[in-house]
């Protein structure tokens, strides 16, 4: 199976190179530490005697937030050191911001080609591997299995689409899932689906989603809300003149332009409408600046300081 996967992966990787190049150019940020994607992490010292190095992989920003309780739990054992990797550039930035003083090392997960994966394994030298949600990388799991390294899948979930696809290739699905030593399903449904795909009951438990274990920041007080309104330029003289605020959260290309058109129509209809844009990928900042410069409404980037007073 692994040789068949490798034969398919190489041409797929070559075909994807133009896409990666375009993505790096358009979004910026994506090229940061790109050598990690080729398995070329900074060289880590070999684990000291009595230390257990765990390779923890979280795909993107959501998973990076969700693993916080898991990291806290692992750190209760002083013999454990964590190497954290993530797949997306935004996840990498968030991981460095949140965990740089809490884990041993932070990097970007390598592309699942045998040469890159093998290089990463030689540099990280983990004693155990923890994956999150639905990450079943054949080469990564093969390297773990070949070395006799235990692998764990936490918050394991199988979407409707993935479940149907795996059912079409049952033998391959079983062989892939067999390389996971323990699975902790996000729900009873996910557990049932994984069992139908061939996971023995002794290897799986339904533990619920770790995202529910993340502590939520307390609601802002009145003074904090006032400060935030000032920073955004949404200050009003009285409660009666508070603007209508529209939020575009985790937006993708094309969605910001649509929201701007809606805002302009609302203003033309007499509504004091303000728009907050929070792109899913912060690296798209230059692209959004060009878009905002091309339309008539005043705008402000919060990271550049206090907002405009009563912007149009």
Language-model-derived ranges and their functions:
Residues 1-8, 12-22:
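Membrane-interacting alpha-helical segments
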Residues 46, 174, 231, 305-306:
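Short secondary-structure boundary/capping segments
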Residues 17-214, 218-219, 251-253, 266, ...:
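Active-site and donor-binding regions of nucleotide-sugar-utilizing enzymes
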Residues 95, 99-108, 289-312:
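Nucleotide-activated donor-binding/catalytic signature segment of Leloir-type glycosyltransferases, i.e.
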Residues 63-77, 223-305:
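Conserved catalytic-core segment of nucleotide-activated headgroup transferases in glycan assembly
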Residues 11, 56, 259:
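A residue-level signal for conserved active-site and pocket-lining positions in enzyme catalytic cores
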Residues 121-125, 219-226, 290-292, 312:
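Short, surface-exposed amphipathic charged segments that create phosphate/polyanion-binding patches used
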Residues 150-152, 244-245, 274, 311-312:
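Structural motif
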């Amino acid at each position: 199976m692994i040789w068949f996967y490798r034969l398919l992966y190489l041409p797929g990787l070559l075909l994807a190179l133009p896409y990666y190049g375009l993505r790096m150019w358009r979004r910026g940020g994506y090229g940061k530490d790109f050598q990690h994607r080729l398995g070329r992490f900074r060289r880590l010292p070999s684990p000291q005697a009595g230390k257990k190095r765990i390779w923890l992989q979280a795909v993107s920003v959501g998973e990076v937030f969700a693993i916080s309780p898991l990291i806290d739990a692992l750190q209760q054992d002083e013999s454990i050191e964590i190497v954290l990797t993530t797949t997306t550039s935004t996840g990498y930035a968030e991981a460095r911001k949140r965990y740089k003083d809490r884990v041993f090392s932070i990097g970007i997960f390598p592309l699942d080609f045998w040469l890159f994966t093998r290089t990463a394994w030689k540099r990280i030298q983990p004693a155990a591997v923890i994956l999150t949600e639905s990450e079943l990388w054949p080469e990564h799991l093969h390297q773990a299995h070949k070395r006799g390294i235990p692998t764990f899948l936490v918050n394991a979930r199988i979407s409707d689409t993935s479940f149907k696809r795996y059912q079409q290739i049952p033998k391959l699905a079983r062989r892939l899932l067999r390389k996971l030593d323990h699975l902790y399903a996000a729900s009873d449904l996910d557990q049932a689906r994984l069992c139908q795909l061939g996971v023995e009951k002794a290897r799986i438990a339904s533990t619920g989603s770790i995202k529910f274990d993340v502590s939520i920041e307390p609601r802002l007080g009145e003074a904090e809300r006032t400060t935030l309104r000032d920073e955004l330029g949404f200050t009003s003289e009285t409660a009666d003149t508070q603007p209508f605020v529209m939020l575009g959260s985790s937006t993708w290309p094309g969605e910001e332009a649509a929201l701007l058109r809606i805002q302009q129509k609302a203003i033309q209809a007499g509504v004091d409408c303000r728009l907050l844009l929070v792109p899913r990928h912060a690296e798209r900042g230059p692209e959004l600046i060009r878009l905002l410069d091309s339309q008539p409404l005043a705008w402000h980037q919060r990271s550049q300081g206090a907002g405009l007073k009563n912007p149009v």
